[in-house]
Amino acid sequence: MARIAGVNIPTNKRVVIALTYIYGIGLSLANRICEGCNIDHNVRVVNLSDDEIIRIRNFIRENYIVEGDLRKEVSMNIKFLTDIGCYRGLRHRRGLPVRGQRTHTNAKTRKGRSKLPVAAKKK
């Protein structure tokens, strides 16, 4: 298995698909990385040379924020919103949808299951 950005990417998949296993890299970004490194999109990770893997690794390190650094940045952004007390921060703190979705009938997963008392069985 090739190791890129601290993640073991699967060797039997195409390069574009394998790069999406890294947090912060989707399909469009994976295509851009392959174009930037001059690597064919359809080649499998098994068939990559060590030089090509090093090129991909360096390209990602120099141009993008991925994995732990990205997770830390996202959590710091959410912490900043909660600290300044803005509306989005309050919604994050309360565990409700942040971007204006309705909550009267939907948002069950974000709100969590309510603790309703279960009716006792009649004897």
Swiss-Prot record:
Family matches, as HAMAP family: Ribosomal_uS13
Pfam families (alphabetical) = Ribosomal_S13
Q: Name the job this protein performs.
A: Located at the top of the head of the 30S subunit, it contacts several helices of the 16S rRNA. In the 70S ribosome it contacts the 23S rRNA (bridge B1a) and protein L5 of the 50S subunit (bridge B1b), connecting the 2 subunits; these bridges are implicated in subunit movement. Contacts the tRNAs in the A and P-sites.
Question: What is the species listed in this Swiss-Prot or TrEMBL entry?
Answer: Ehrlichia canis (strain Jake)
Q: Where is this region: Disordered?
A: 97-123
A cellular component term (GO) from this record? small ribosomal subunit
Key words of the record? Ribonucleoprotein, Ribosomal protein, RNA-binding, rRNA-binding, tRNA-binding
> Which InterPro entries does its entry note?
Rbsml_uS13_C, Ribosomal_uS13, Ribosomal_uS13-like_H2TH, Ribosomal_uS13_bac-type, Ribosomal_uS13_CS
- Could you provide one GO biological process annotation from this protein's UniProt record? translation
Q: Which family does it belong to?
A: Belongs to the universal ribosomal protein uS13 family.
Question: What would you give as a GO molecular function for this chain, any one?
Answer: tRNA binding
How this chain assembles, per its entry, is: Part of the 30S ribosomal subunit. Forms a loose heterodimer with protein S19. Forms two bridges to the 50S subunit in the 70S ribosome.
Please report the name of this protein according to its UniProt entry: Small ribosomal subunit protein uS13
